[in-house]
Design a protein with these regions (language model features):
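Core nucleotide-handling region used for phosphoryl-transfer chemistry
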Residues: 2-44, 49-54, 58-395
Length: 395
């Protein structure tokens, strides 16, 4: 069964998800992105990652041919599929239910073949406000606020529409929804003249991007070489890491949670050495918290032993853990060079809402697609931190 596009992973997280294979994959992606930004022969595709919510899956049901909508729950073992308002009332509630009813009403008008996945951008929650020195139509589906000048062609189109969505993934095959095969990228050119709906494209036109200068390319190749060097030393340990630990205290997922604590707190990584030392404290605190929750003495002993074994493993593998942290940081550094280059392309205005008004920000990020596989390119400190703190408009 194919894996649906329910969650894309960050490029640097691939070493924690797939071990040494993930490191090899991340380097392949980075090298191909370098080709894409320096010469016209790249097979790499890039899409813009819109900060829409909720995720919407819709189209013709592969078994019945009837139009349906739903969230990512359509791929569950007990799929939550809505073919009419009654289904929505049974399966959903609140503002999400209202938005899904709008999706049924308006997306069913689109010439959709098969099944598409996208992100909802707005329904009845558009707001006209002054952003900078222009009156703009704004919508905030999740963390980022999008702003389009009111008097432009796109602004007028959005003003007339009842719903806005961006599609990024198509599905084909069957016989059931969960058996369908995803393909990244959707041609939305034939969906542009349907009354009441504005369909945005996620495609990123690389021709609009500023190419790397020779100096840029030298700096970028140096960043990749640095990542390759640390990965070479971390490679064997990354494969051990995937199978180390027990239950929710498997070490690879714990490293992901640990790295994310820096982002939640709005902190950049200090040195690789400091991050490595900090993981011991993080692991200790997580196990101590779990031990304190246990009532039975036998269960407490189990987790006390797990903690002791884990700390012993961490101490014995301090150097490979250091190289793992260094690899993560080096991959992030190389990825950031690409992000900054892609961000130079001007698109729809993107802002973060603050207590003092709106602050200009970059798009959420990009998705790099290579040989049917996709990884996220996101400035996590900028976007993900805001994602944890900015109040959302739907629930």
């Amino acid at each position: 069964m194919a894996k649906q596009n329910t969650h894309l992973e960050h490029l640097e997280d691939d070493i924690l998800n797939q071990g040494s294979r993930g490191g090899f994959n991340a380097i392949k992606f980075l090298n191909e992105l370098g080709v894409m930004l320096s010469e016209p022969r790249s097979s790499m595709r890039v899409t813009t990652k819109w900060d829409g919510a909720p995720a919407i899956i819709c189209g013709k049901h592969p078994e019945t041919g009837d139009f349906f909508v739903g969230t990512k729950g359509v791929f569950a073992k007990l799929p939550k599929i809505c073919m009419n308002d009654g289904d929505v009332d049974v399966l959903y509630s609140g503002e999400l239910a209202n938005k899904l009813k709008d999706c049924l009403k308006y997306l069913s008008k689109l010439p959709i073949k098969g099944v598409l996945q996208g992100d909802l951008l707005y329904t009845n929650d558009k707001v006209i406000r002054k952003v900078g020195d222009q009156q703009s139509i704004t919508f905030q589906p999740n963390t980022i606020t999008y702003a389009v000048p009111k008097d432009t062609d796109l602004g007028k189109k959005i003003a007339k529409s009842k719903l806005g969505i961006v599609f990024h993934t198509s599905y084909s095959g069957g016989p059931e929804l969960r058996d369908m095969i995803p393909s990244f990228g959707v041609d939305v050119s034939k969906m542009q003249n349907v009354p009441g709906v504005t369909v945005f494209s996620s495609d990123f036109n690389v021709k609009d991007a500023t190419m790397f200068t020779p100096q840029d390319m030298t700096r970028y190749k140096s960043a990749i070489k640095k990542a390759e060097g640390s990965l070479k030393q971390a490679s064997k340990f990354l494969d051990i890491l995937k199978t180390s630990g027990e239950g929710k205290f498997m070490l690879a997922p714990m490293f992901k949670i640990y790295f994310n604590t820096y982002i939640r707190q709005g902190k950049t990584f200090p040195s690789a050495d400091a991050v490595t030392r900090g993981f011991t404290d993080f692991y200790t605190q997580a196990l101590d918290k779990e031990i304190a929750l246990k009532k039975q003495e036998s269960t407490k002993k189990k987790y006390i032993k797990m903690k002791e074994d884990g700390l012993k493993f961490i101490k014995q593998n301090s150097k490979p853990i250091y190289m793992t942290v260094a690899s993560y940081m080096n991959l992030t550094a190389a990825k950031t060079i690409v992000i900054r280059q892609l961000e130079r392309v001007k698109g729809i205005g993107t802002y973060i809402r603050t207590d003092n008004g709106f602050r200009v920000t970059a798009p959420e990020g990009f998705v790099a697609i290579r040989s049917g596989n996709a990884l996220k390119l996101v400035d996590r400190l900028e976007f993900s931190r805001a994602n944890f703190t900015v109040e959302k408009n739907w629930g």
